[in-house]
């Protein structure tokens, strides 16, 4: 009988593994003898067939490793491996299990020539722009049918109502620092744009200066402005949020930057910029979601406004690198998606004053496979609604509000960079009840958005392009 157990390695030499040993080494030394070098099983059962005899949740697997089962020949690993190392093994097993399960799966691959089938709707892809864009980041829709697209390098481009890329870009934009993952990122129209003309931009604000050795030093942090476009010129600029220069970082990672508007407020994200514990520090903007009036003033009812040690614009904290932010049109609930490290990408329900845990708790580990933390939950810290292991590199988020795909109405569309996919999540009573991959292997999905025409617009990186999803065969 093939029991699904995490069995002991034959022989106890070399069991004490250094904390920074990579997870593949931990597995090879302590687990492969019974479960196979490829997780296929042996004395112990397979770890990739999905048939868990003693509970298949992450907590169950962690407990099986830590506590063992002497009757079935498994040594308790607690005291030999640290909690962090055991947690990294759980993530590693999940990655390999997912890899095995995905083999042979026929994902809905988009095509401009053929119809792509999904559970509820069939569609085809129409390419609007496949030449001329350079690292597009976000899209916004003007009332006259034109689209605005940001390019990470600092340009704001226009796509005509006919779907052609205008060769001229907008002049006079604020200077953005194109460095690492940062640059010109988010663009959004004020909800009353037709009356006031305001357009909001999120970008890496900072400086490039030579140090005393003549080497260029770059320091930046995410900032938000608004302005108006007249002809091809950016005018009437106002700062909505510009962090004090003392908060600028030389890191090139984790800028965040997405916007949501609601009832006169703007919500926006600043990533933790690689300073992990800064996400827990209310005196710093890193790793926070902000809520301000749409003119940049601080609301009097913000959760930390009376805390003298906190930045008053902070709405929530403990975030790593959110690159998706969206509001449910049915009830006004706000959700974010944020990149985990290796594993642990998250979808969170955003509620005022709450701590989302990074980096104290996470469902991921370091990119190099070394352990990070040994706990995934802690009192006073929020759990994600769902998390993805392995990571899909969540980026771009929108509730479908159009009428072209009626069976997807109010479903949440989640883009993925690394996995090159869009997932459709059904949310009921603020819980995820199902998810489906509806778009796969057509480029790194940077942004996904419902257009005013009801079609779904997608920006991809790698092959930089703008495409849209059109119903077919319904």
Feature names for model-found ranges:
Residues 319, 431-452:
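Conserved blade-ending motifs and adjacent loop-strand segments that build the rim/top face
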Residues 85-86, 93-276, 324-327, 333-336, ...:
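Acidic, Gly/Ser/Thr-rich repeat motifs that build Ca2+-stabilized beta-propeller blades
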Residues 19-40, 53, 61-67, 130:
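Sequence/structural segment immediately N-terminal to covalent heme-attachment motifs in c-type
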Residues 11-26, 255, 311:
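Electrostatic cytochrome c docking/interface patches
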Residues 219-232, 282-295, 350-351:
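Beta-propeller blade signature
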Residues 101-125, 234, 297-307, 360-380, ...:
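Blade/loop signatures of beta-propeller domains
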Residues 27-38, 43, 73, 85, ...:
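Short pre-active-site segment immediately N-terminal to redox-active cysteine/selenocysteine motifs
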Residues 38-42, 48-98, 184:
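Extracytoplasmic electron-transfer domains, predominantly the class I c-type cytochrome c fold
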